[in-house]
Amino acid sequence: MIACSGPRGMVKIEPNGNEAAPEDSLEYELIVMDPGFETWYMLQNTPARYRSQEYYEGWNQQYVSAWNYLATQPGRRSFFQTIMGYEPGEDYGFELNHKLFYYFQYVEQVLRIPILDHRPVGVVF
């Protein structure tokens, strides 16, 4: 499970509570506690903009690494309070990786809180 909290709310990645799922097919769910994100995400979430799961995983690894670094820096902790436990080798699936990637875009572009020095090229909002 990962959780990140800030003045706007909290983000969690946790196993989905589906008890009937076999152990080898664990599903995860991303929960964002910022109502502004959900509305924004619905407007941005169009299949014409989809990239591959590998694309989102690559960017998410960079964003999580930067997020975790910022969470350990004095003065930056007001927004980046919690370390994210996103594991590079774990298969979180397309939907979760897509939504997490868009959460990072929301933080940078809507909330105007920089995370990475460089951004994905060709991502238009």
Language model regions located:
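Compact alpha-helical subdomains of small soluble proteins
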Residues: 62, 70-125
